[in-house]
């Protein structure tokens, strides 16, 4: 495709979006359109199709690692950064939503905005290829004080230090916490060490007047709730 023809094609797909929105776009056309904003003077359709052929879905494209995206011919540092930034936007939006809501029902001590929480966790760590352990610290009014990436591990484990969590609870004057970690294997079944760690932290928090409300294992396809399964 000549540069003139390519420019005309870009304008046509942009015009299609301006007139009709995203409805009617194939997944590769969405990627093609996005890539026109970070890849100048180049036909982005083949790149978009190769991305979907390799990663199978838009979600997987946006959550793919820098190294994996680097294997796609035509993608450079700028375009990969652009795609990675797009992949982070949902978790930022969901995090902001959670900040403005009471996360725990005071009467039942259950999570009152679990759908948003699960969307946040799935977008933040559900697609990661190594285990990451998150702690959400809550105030006495059940509002989020802080989201913390507590530890980063390997493919099947992360090193979590309960003392560091207790120290943070004291410093923040948190009254409850929610734990979450991902399983890169996509198997949501808790391991023996997951259960033991959960029990240890729940017991230890009581010494500081705080509660463990929930522990969630998240993957890109599902989740496991310790609370729902009666393990807390």
From Swiss-Prot:
Q: Which residues bind Zn(2+)?
A: 181, 183, 194
In chain numbering, motif JAMM motif lies across: 181-194
Q: Which GO terms describe its biological process?
A: proteolysis
Q: What Gene3D superfamilies does UniProt report for this protein, alphabetically?
A: 5' to 3' exonuclease, C-terminal subdomain, Cytidine Deaminase, domain 2
Q: What Pfam families does the annotation carry?
A: RadC, UPF0758_N
**Which GO terms label this protein's molecular function in UniProt?**
metal ion binding; metallopeptidase activity
What keywords appear on the UniProt entry? Hydrolase, Metal-binding, Metalloprotease, Protease, Zinc
Q: Which InterPro entries match?
A: MPN, RadC_JAB, RuvA_2-like, UPF0758, UPF0758_N
> Where would I find the MPN domain in this sequence?
110-232
Source superkingdom: Bacteria
Q: Which PANTHER family match?
A: DNA REPAIR PROTEIN RADC, UPF0758 PROTEIN YEES-RELATED
**What family, per the record?**
Belongs to the UPF0758 family.
The protein's name is: UPF0758 protein FN0909
């Amino acid at each position: 495709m000549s540069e003139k023809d390519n420019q005309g094609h870009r304008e046509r797909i942009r015009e299609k979006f301006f007139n009709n929105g995203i409805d009617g776009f194939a997944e590769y056309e969405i990627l093609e359109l996005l890539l026109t904003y970070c890849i100048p003077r180049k036909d982005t359709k083949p790149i978009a199709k190769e991305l979907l052929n390799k990663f199978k879905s838009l979600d997987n494209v946006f959550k793919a690692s820098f190294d994996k995206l680097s294997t796609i011919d035509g993608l450079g540092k700028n375009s990969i950064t652009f795609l990675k930034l797009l992949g982070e936007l949902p978790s930022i939006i969901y995090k902001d939503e959670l900040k403005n809501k009471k996360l725990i029902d005071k009467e039942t001590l259950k999570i009152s905005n679990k759908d948003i929480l699960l969307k946040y966790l799935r977008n933040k760590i559900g697609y990661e290829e190594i285990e990451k352990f998150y702690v959400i610290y809550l105030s006495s009014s059940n509002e989020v004080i802080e989201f913390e990436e507590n530890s980063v591990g390997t493919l099947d484990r992360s090193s979590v230090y309960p003392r560091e969590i207790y120290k943070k609870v004291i410093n923040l004057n948190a009254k409850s916490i929610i734990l979450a970690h991902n399983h890169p294997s996509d198997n949501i079944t808790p391991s023996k060490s997951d259960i033991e760690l959960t029990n240890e932290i729940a017991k230890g928090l009581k010494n500081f007047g705080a509660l463990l409300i929930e522990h969630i294992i998240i993957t890109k396809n599902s989740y496991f709730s310790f609370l729902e399964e009666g393990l807390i």
